[in-house]
């Protein structure tokens, strides 16, 4: 019997003696649920996990104690996230009227949030209690897997069959016109994206390639929660605005991963208000990296960012796709891919040092020489939109990553073994400027915004 991961939800099929799990299923809980489908009636069972080449799969192969010694229920959730709380309040009001006495159950601020929902005509107030304003069943509008309010339906032209559904963000990143959509091993080309009706039209087409979207990200800090100095850097936990512009897509040949062409994407930017764990490399780290040539530090930053994300996902019991990262100048951002944040970045901030130790261990234990998809390079199993061509083009990303990790952990300086790397001709990054007085910085930013408006006129 072959099944998708849906089998893990508790269906008792009975009579199974073994289970083969292909690739890490995403969390310890999912692994135990899938493994638990076998041996339910007749004693012992046998479970195999066929590991992929992603860092998480390889981590559990080398560290089985992380699997069998982990609690499957230690999930991370941000209960104060207004995106989550507002949806729960609306659903709760359908069951029973809400009052200020519910602060003990639902957390402080229920009254204030209900007032806002009343202004938005989702709740109505009568006699100090809030009721649902409309005759509806609100739970049908609450997504369990995403905070997006919109889902795109995927329609196959010809037979006019509905083949699937994707949330708004995933659709923007993978179902743009010209994209290749893969469904049940068949390839389809996206012919039209109808934003009005949230409909994507695809046509079955045999291709020898798949597509990857190209993006540019801009991260703006809107509120700082915590900051502290660590070895080689300053780390900060902050609310951020992530603006992602889709610049185009590339066509990648199956199996060889050869780039065979590009296409244009004409879609509006994606905006996300979330929480980020920021690693700001100090001036000394940037300056010391210069002796190893151009591209060295940037490549190391990408390697650290990718592995930090994956190993944070293990601790947070989430899919790596729930976390993203961005490298810009001397900054590494690790942020939640969920509006308002859901607690993953906060865990990364709290356990910064411990996760970096895991990252170094993963790099050292990988048997490759220069870097591979099991450690610092992007893998073919999922989109790695933040790992740009620079990390692929630098010949020794593993050595660069290892050097940077020694700096960030305060270990004895690591001497990278670089052969054939071009001699340094210029600094790979501009060293960060000394910090401005906060009031001065605000004034400069204000002037920049005002002059920008003037140019538009």
Regions found by a protein language model. Give the residues of each.
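Conserved two-lobed SF2 helicase motor
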Residues: 1-9
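Hydrophobic beta-strand segment of the Class I
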Residues: 19
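Secondary-structure transition/capping motifs at alpha-helix termini
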Residues: 9, 13, 22-23, 27, ...
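Conserved segment of the helicase C-terminal RecA-like domain
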Residues: 27-78
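Short, ordered loop/turn segments at secondary-structure junctions
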Residues: 6-7, 16, 24-26, 52-53, ...
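Short acidic, glycine/serine/threonine-rich loops at helix termini
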Residues: 12-15, 31-34, 43, 58-63, ...
